[in-house]
Amino acid sequence: MPGLLVAGTTSDAGKSTLTAGLCRAFARRGVRVAPFKAQNMSNNSMVCQGPGGAGVEIGRAQWVQALAANATPEAAMNPVLLKPGSDHRSHVVLMGRSWGELASSNWFEGRQVLADTAHRAFDDLAARYDVVVAEGAGSPAEINLRAGDYVNMGLARHAELPTIVVGDIDRGGVFAAFFGTIALLSVEDQALVAGFVVNKFRGDLDLLAPGLRDLERVTGRQVFGTLPWHADLWLDSEDALDLTGRRAASAGAHRVAVVRLPRISNFTDVDALGLEPDLDVVFASDPRGLGDADLIVVPGTRATIADLAWLRARGLDRALMAHVAAGKPLLGICGGFQMLGRVIRDPDGVEGPVAEADGLGLLDVETTFGAEKVLRLPRGQGLGVTASGYEIHHGRITAGDAAQQFLGGARDGQVFGTMWHGSLEGDALREAFLRETLGLTESGTSFSAARERRLDLLGDLVERHLDVDALLALARHGCAPALPFLPPGAP
């Protein structure tokens, strides 16, 4: 099948970024290209339109990769989405719809259904597009997971996909990681690995060249290029690993503190705030981090009651109360909004074992979780402007008399709560909100234009630093025969 698998030496090696960059570069050549990830484990997701106009849910990274490919996002691009609610339990989204829960103890019992669905989705995309660029997960050399793999080499074997391995040289040890990744694969899997891409290189490329030549010599595989480290190159993140890379506060700007909840979800909601020139966005997990904030955001979460208990245990509830008492603005989004209400009920254990918990009482609303997940793309009025967003939640909101309506949520003075993810990506709503809460004037920032510039920048870097023609030929025609075997192979 025409396609390519982008595997990585580790998590966060650059698979999502490289996949998006290849999609943009191939699309520029007139190729009808689609992104794909068989299984994504992330609480950052997006709603797109499914059959009949119904909402379907996919990983945020695949949604952005579809934008890079100039393709319409769809459930087949991320057929299995796992949303961790605890260290041992994940909510499963199958072809965009809620499927159920899987615990680590019964993971292998449900794996075959997920694998079959994922491989059918890939085959469907491959039949409709010229090339499918598939992103792997973690590393293909996780020998403890090999038997159940359908995301990395399991997918590559299914579709006979040539595979490239990307490694983050900024972490160090990339040559050992490249060699070791291949050397732990079986003979059959090694035959599908065509070569490497080095990611996040800083410095003089001439100093790296001898190492690249040696890597090609000892592995018998091509290095397709080296992507430079670039400070402005960040895309919608897949998981919380990327939170550590957010910029720190600088003097003079209004400080926005985002509560870093243990099961934080859709933290891309604040990306648009990070582009505003008069704001500095930081993530905080203790009261000191919230103390001097001009605006606090409590984001979404996959475990609302559990994260509310964590928030109280760390004294963050008192910090939020003090912030509101000082007349400063507070915004809660989805699960964060539900925490600001009077009570949260989960009688059926949708999110966890605790059936009921008192909220912070800052908004006159109550939340009750139901089994059916709401997936919507709402549009309406807020703060005098047209706004839009997306909803992904099990919670049903009941508002009291004191609650003033705000974007599917409620407002009381400077305390705002909304069920709409992504509303701040709308320039008009964001400007109105910042004017209302912080007194800021319009900056002229366009979030959608900024995202498109980043995708173009990524495409430019891929075109400039990688052998795109060779990668496209690889995707169309597959690996060269008789690639050398690196011992010891699969244990």
Swiss-Prot record:
Give residue ranges for domain GATase cobBQ-type: 253-429
Q: Which residues form the active site?
A: 334, 421
Pathway this chain belongs to: Cofactor biosynthesis; adenosylcobalamin biosynthesis
Q: What SUPFAM superfamilies does the database record attribute to this sequence?
A: Class I glutamine amidotransferase-like, P-loop containing nucleoside triphosphate hydrolases
Against InterPro entries, the record matches this protein to:
Class_I_gatase-like, CobQ/CobB/MinD/ParA_Nub-bd_dom, CobQ_GATase1, CobQ_N, CobQ_synth, GATase_3, P-loop_NTPase
BP GO annotations: cobalamin biosynthetic process
CDD domains membership:
CobQ_N, GATase1_CobQ
Entry keywords, A to Z:
Cobalamin biosynthesis, Glutamine amidotransferase
Molecular function per GO: ABC-type vitamin B12 transporter activity; catalytic activity
Q: What is any Pfam family matched here? A: CbiA
What residue intervals traverse the membrane?
Answer: none
Specify whether Lipid metabolism is a keyword of the entry.
Answer: no
Instruction: Please state which protein family the record places this protein in.
Output: Belongs to the CobB/CobQ family. CobQ subfamily.
Provide the function of this protein: Catalyzes amidations at positions B, D, E, and G on adenosylcobyrinic A,C-diamide. NH(2) groups are provided by glutamine, and one molecule of ATP is hydrogenolyzed for each amidation.
HAMAP family (UniProt xref) = CobQ (MF_00028)
The name this protein goes by in its record: Cobyric acid synthase
